[in-house]
Amino acid sequence: MAYELSTLQLSCVAFVAFMAVLVFRTRTRNLKQNVPPGPRPLPIIGNFFDLPPKGQPEYLHWFKHKDAYGPVSSINVMGTTLVIFHDKDAAHAVMGKKAQKTSARPQLNFAQLCGFENFLITHQYNDKYRLHRKMVHQEIGTKGLSAGFRPIQEQESIRFILQTFNRPDDILQHLKTLAAAIVLKITYGYSIERKGQDPLVELIEHAMENLSQAFVPLAWAVDSVPAIKYLPDWFPGMSYRKTARKWRAINEAAAELPYDFVKRQMAHKAHQPSYVSNLLEKHMIKSEDNKINVSAADEEAIKWTAVSLYAAGSDSTVAIIHSVICGLVMFPEVVTRAQEEIDRVVGSDRLPNFDDRTNLPYVDGIIKEAWRWNPVGPMGLTHKSEEDLVCGEYLIPKGSYLLPSLWWFLNDPKEYPEPRVFKPERYMEPFNHPDPSEIAFGYGRRSCAGRYFADASVYITVVQLLAVFNVRKARDDQGNEIPVTLQAIPGMVNRPAPFQFKVEPRSQHHIDLLRRIESEQIPEVSHASLLKPSTV
């Protein structure tokens, strides 16, 4: 979603001018109290034109502010202050140490109309959020709990390896299948359709695409000019309401259909243990008819935290593994050293597993380096201050949007020398650089609840890929290697721009291993036909 001043916004300025001036004057009084520096605002609209332009990733746009205005800078849009942190210590002081006062989310009118306020990552910091996060934490929030899902992750990784063996040119689609299969099986005990498009995957991915657009601060007219929400539907430019109603229906279907699937499977005692079935069993209210009944509050929490797991896990898993592949292609010496370690520790007669990780420090470093080199959330998700805060010499006004540049914290050459080099050994002796996961998974009480689960999915996929495949640059028709660079593309989830690469088995011995593993696989029956048809 681009930041653009639309015709609607311009036409509404006159309608809301008086209110806007009042709000602007009230809120910008704080500007005299030494808020962080930034570009000079225009009357009424403030720094609207200083928001990221269409087609540019946010973190690259805000990075320019670091050199122009310092490590903590700000802009003001229609009376709302945005504070951008390129100072890790300052960000930690505000969003870590003062998490109780800075864990709120911006009140985005458009996202709320779409129903995204039900997703865990977009909840306000309140009792509902704490209940939902506690529910997730109790099921997958620790290393021990996430270890219980390893058999599923390992099996799906093997399927990914075999799909790549048979159709290497479709590896990115195989990655999407892998991520969806893991999350849906763990969350709902649902087996996806592998011979075509799965209806549940399609539905939830549609919801995630909408989320990415809806949750960009001040990108929608009703967020930058809130007064227009009081205008009638017939007023020019109110089409955003039709979009919001459509997206809300998609969100509700994405939450309801798989939840209903689990309940029906449990009623027939045909369910697979999953996040949803485990919680239903824990919160079930006994009844004479043996139906699966839970309180309305528990049902809402189970239903929406479940779909939130997909929102947080699937897209980010694909993005980070794609970044690993980019790093391997750009720095071929990493592939060589990783394969030497795998061959020495594991051998070449089986695939690596989770038990091998502690003996594969270089491969473990590849996973750490991926989270650092191209973080999935380079600006995190926006926090909001709930009261005036002091940050060093600056005042952060109540209601400010807080944007930490996680990308810079993880690419600061003072912390990570040669930051644009993909260098897994930086976490080993004698370098011992800081573990990037402490930053990459977010701040304070908004940190990713499924971080151990996500990291495990990435590890098992990458280590098994490297064990049997060479990953290298593609060649053109003249046999010359095609150069690869890491290019950013805009979006809430950071992923590499498309690039060409080649994946092929390492040797005939590895081909034989893959064929043996393939012969041992038991076909899986899809649950797609058991879903109730969606009306969306």
Curated annotation (Swiss-Prot):
Fumagillin and its derivatives have been intensely studied for their potential use in the treatment of amebiasis, microsporidiosis and rheumatoid arthritis. They have also interesting antiangiogenic properties by the irreversible inhibition of human type 2 methionine aminopeptidase (METAP2). The chain crosses the membrane at residues 4-24. Glycans are attached at N210, N293. Pathway: Secondary metabolite biosynthesis; terpenoid biosynthesis. Heme binds at C448. The keyword Glycosyltransferase does not apply. The gene is af510. It is an enzyme of class 1 (oxidoreductase). It is found in: Membrane. InterPro entries: Cyt_P450, Cyt_P450_CS, Cyt_P450_E_grp-I, Cyt_P450_sf, Cytochrome_P450_fung. Multifunctional cytochrome P450 monooxygenase; part of the gene cluster that mediates the biosynthesis of fumagillin, a meroterpenoid that has numerous biological activities including irreversible inhibition of human type 2 methionine aminopeptidase (METAP2). Within the pathway, the multifunctional cytochrome P450 monooxygenase af510 acts as a 2,4,6-trichlorophenol monooxygenase that first performs the C-H hydroxylation at the bridgehead C5 position to yield 5R-hydroxyl-beta-trans-bergamotene. PANTHER family: P450, PUTATIVE (EUROFUNG)-RELATED (PTHR46300:SF7), P450, PUTATIVE (EUROFUNG)-RELATED-RELATED (PTHR46300). Belongs to the cytochrome P450 family. GO terms for biological process: fumagillin biosynthetic process; terpenoid biosynthetic process. It catalyses: (+)-exo-beta-bergamotene + 2 reduced [NADPH--hemoprotein reductase] + 3 O2 = 5-dehydro-6-demethoxyfumagillol + 2 oxidized [NADPH--hemoprotein reductase] + 3 H2O + 2 H(+). Its EC number is 1.14.14.184. GO terms for molecular function: heme binding; iron ion binding; monooxygenase activity; oxidoreductase activity, acting on paired donors, with incorporation or reduction of molecular oxygen. It is a single-pass membrane protein. This is Multifunctional cytochrome P450 monooxygenase af510. Induction: Expression is controlled by the fumagillin biosynthesis cluster regulator fumR. Expression is also under the control of the developmental and secondary metabolism regulator veA. Expression is significantly up-regulated during infection. It comes from Aspergillus fumigatus (strain ATCC MYA-4609 / CBS 101355 / FGSC A1100 / Af293) (Neosartorya fumigata).
